[in-house]
Amino acid sequence: MDGVPLHLQIITPQTRNTIDSDTLHPCLVYVQGSAWLEQNINAKLGILSRLAEKGYVIAVVEYRHSGIAPFPAQALDTRNAIRFMKIHAAEYNVDMDKVFVGGDSSGGHTAMFSQLLHDDDQDTNLYPGTNADVKGILSIHEDTILSPILMFHGTKDRTINPRVSVTVYQKLKSCGKDVRVYLLEGADHGGSEFWTEETQEIVVK
């Protein structure tokens, strides 16, 4: 985008040589948190590989960081990553009806904001004819929020007060939406507490 080469790190449940072509997998398009600065998209490959072992195709997004492109470039690049995975669904055995987007820290914000945009909102669509909708969608208009939202927040988060997630949860719940929030006791802004077997089981369900 804008002359900047971008990459996806793709982790599959099996090696490319042993993929069962008859088995389709859900896909998580994952945005690595970086305070919207330059990312290290290899930072969580080990942790994300554990989700792949549970049957997910993982696509870790590299976006144009805020030092070279203003917001909402990061969300737009995430949308194009979603489209890329849809176009290449057959190649990676992705179930088109089970594409999700998520992320940690600023990546979680970017992932959610990617679903607030629409194709006519400054969108730079590299793949015309392919939408960037996912299984979990958050719309800016609360009456059109249709899909489930899952949030994790540490009770000792020193960056974002956990009350923020609680407030979002309460607002969406009052609108009759399907939303869950898990407050992880003693967890700060990220860390191993977010990647336990228990939290992974919640995600894959």
Set out the residue ranges of the language-model regions.
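Short beta-strand/loop motif that positions the catalytic acidic residue
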Residues: 145, 151-153, 157
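Conserved alpha/beta-hydrolase "acid-adjacent" motif
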Residues: 158-167
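Primarily recognizes the serine-hydrolase "nucleophile elbow" in alpha/beta-hydrolase
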Residues: 80-144
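N-terminal cap/lid segment of alpha/beta-hydrolase-fold proteins
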Residues: 1-23
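Short amphipathic alpha-helix adjacent to the substrate-entry channel of hydrolases
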Residues: 41-60
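C-terminal catalytic histidine-bearing segment of alpha/beta-hydrolase fold enzymes
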Residues: 150-152, 166-205
